[in-house]
Swiss-Prot record:
Gene Ontology molecular function terms on file: RNA binding; structural constituent of ribosome
Location in or out of the cell: Cytoplasm, Cytosol; Cytoplasm; Rough endoplasmic reticulum
Function: Component of the large ribosomal subunit. The ribosome is a large ribonucleoprotein complex responsible for the synthesis of proteins in the cell.
Keywords: Cytoplasm, Endoplasmic reticulum, Ribonucleoprotein, Ribosomal protein
Endoplasmic reticulum as UniProt keyword: yes
InterPro entries recorded: Ribosomal_eL18, Ribosomal_eL18/eL18-A/B/_CS, Ribosomal_uL15/eL18, Ribosomal_uL15/eL18_sf
Name under which the protein is recorded: Large ribosomal subunit protein eL18
A GO cellular component annotation in the UniProt record: cytosolic large ribosomal subunit
Subunit structure: Component of the large ribosomal subunit.
Length: 179
């Protein structure tokens, strides 16, 4: 018998444009040919993150952003988050920060506006095209509850199965495949 060569899995598929229409104008600015925005490596990373789905653009809490911006060498820099910035009620005092994000939650916006200077991505692209004084931040992608379900095979410990009923959950050892 011969070897079957399947070429349908050869090519590496990358998103070339965003699925959402809301981000399309931002992509046009960051792709603008001949401008400083299209050549800077920082902007290429931002452009690639703009294409990503919402699961790959997880929300970042204010507490995590504050913790990341307190690291040495990051004072007086702009925190760039390609995603949503959410509120954290455990934080009472927010230090002075400059933030550029796609979206800031409504409850968070009223609280943050007192302490934080918020820039849109369009303003960030026009203000400093080469991004010398900015830090690109991202939240952990596997922090979602759903990622526990597709971590391991069903018989491995700490796997969270999709349970149809609790009877099946109690009989879990009988339902798994054993050699």
């Amino acid at each position: 018998m011969g070897i079957v060569i399947q070429h349908n899995k050869d090519r590496l598929v990358r998103p070339k444009q965003p699925l959402s229409e809301d981000i399309t104008l931002l992509v046009k600015i960051y792709r603008l040919p001949g401008s400083k925005c299209s050549t800077a490596p920082f902007n290429k990373v931002v452009l690639r993150r703009l294409f990503m789905s919402r699961t790959h653009r997880p929300p970042m809490s204010v507490s995590r952003m504050i913790r990341k911006m307190k690291l040495p060498g990051r004072e007086n820099r702009t925190a760039v988050v390609v995603g949503t910035v959410t509120d954290d009620v455990r934080i009472h005092e927010i230090p002075n920060l400059k933030v550029s994000a796609l979206k800031i939650t409504r409850r968070n916006r009223t609280r943050i506006l007192k302490f934080v200077q918020i820039m849109r991505f369009v303003g960030l692209a026009l203000a400093a095209p080469n991004r010398q004084k900015s830090v690109l931040l991202s939240a952990p992608r596997n922090a979602r509850d759903v990622s526990r379900h597709f971590a391991n095979a069903p018989s491995i410990p700490h796997t969270k199965p999709y349970v149809l009923s609790n009877k099946l959950r109690r009989r879990g050892s009988k339902l798994t495949y054993n050699n």
